Amino acid sequence: MKAPVRVAVTGAAGQIGYALLFRIASGEMLGKDQPVILQLLELPIEKAQAALKGVMMELEDCAFPLLAGMVGTDDAEVAFKDVDIALLVGSRPRGPGMERKDLLLANAEIFTAQGAALNKVAKRDVKVLVVGNPANTNAYIAMKSAPDLDPKNFTAMLRLDHNRALSQLSAKLGKPVAGIEKLAVWGNHSPTMYPDYRFATADGASVGDAINDQEWNASTFIPTVGKRGAAIIEARGLSSAASAANAAIDHIRDWVLGTNGKWVTMGVPSDGSYGIPEGVMFGFPVTTENGKYTIVKDLPIDDFSQKYIDKTLAELEEERSGVAHLLG
């Protein structure tokens, strides 16, 4: 049996955490031969800690063969001690009357502290995925707060947008999602992100040629993917939790186990590709191998695409400048 991998999950008793933990413990994220130790963080509030205890009792009651141990805590340094993987799910949700700016600042405090704790106690090659919104900027803050860790250790989740776009294309084409490749999603995990099927193929044939409808792309596809989260809240009365958990599992599994040359979307610190300033946490098409991701390079960007990329970049730059004073 392999040595267990230590996986930290923050916001562990929340909706996404509840949809996530049982799938990690069953081996869906890292493989059916990989034991895990779950290190679970919740708020230092009696109700949250009680809920966490209940979730841990349920995890015990599943008797997962791969669950080699659990820690539940309200201390980030305990949760992140020696972790190989950290899923930062917990974040401050937007309350009534809260401006986006207030939300940014409330979360900046959380992710500054979590970045510093990871910097202090996590494994040096820890893989960090930020799920809590605003995910790109929260990931940027955590990265900047962990100066001793490689910036490449930090990623933001755009896989939910990627999966949403895949499913819309599948429905439009009447083809299974498994056959659709080379989809890209650019930018921020927000309604400004740009799902781009110009390079995509379905069963080897060009998706763009098959759809051949720029009006559908601009007025149906892009806004449907961008506003899908809001549509789910409208329908369910709660935000998308199971699909977000599923995307987090996809993201980590592909990062750790590799994509075999297939493109996926990850929010990663830019290396200057496509004119995105270095260090901006931006959604790019990537491939992964041996636990490392590589941005897909040299794709032609047409005027239509550039306009969307500029817009989502402007939003990220604005978020970044809104928290700059906190990062020294």
UniProtKB/Swiss-Prot annotation:
Active-site residues, Swiss-Prot/TrEMBL: 189 (proton acceptor)
GO molecular function: L-malate dehydrogenase (NAD+) activity
InterPro entries given in the database record: L-lactate/malate_DH, Lactate/malate_DH_C, Lactate/malate_DH_N, Lactate_DH/Glyco_Ohase_4_C, Malate_DH_type2, NAD(P)-bd_dom_sf
Record's keyword terms, sorted: NAD, Oxidoreductase, Tricarboxylic acid cycle
Family according to the record: Belongs to the LDH/MDH superfamily. MDH type 2 family.
Function: Catalyzes the reversible oxidation of malate to oxaloacetate.
Protein name per UniProt: Malate dehydrogenase
Source species of the chain: Xanthomonas euvesicatoria pv. vesicatoria (strain 85-10) (Xanthomonas campestris pv. vesicatoria)
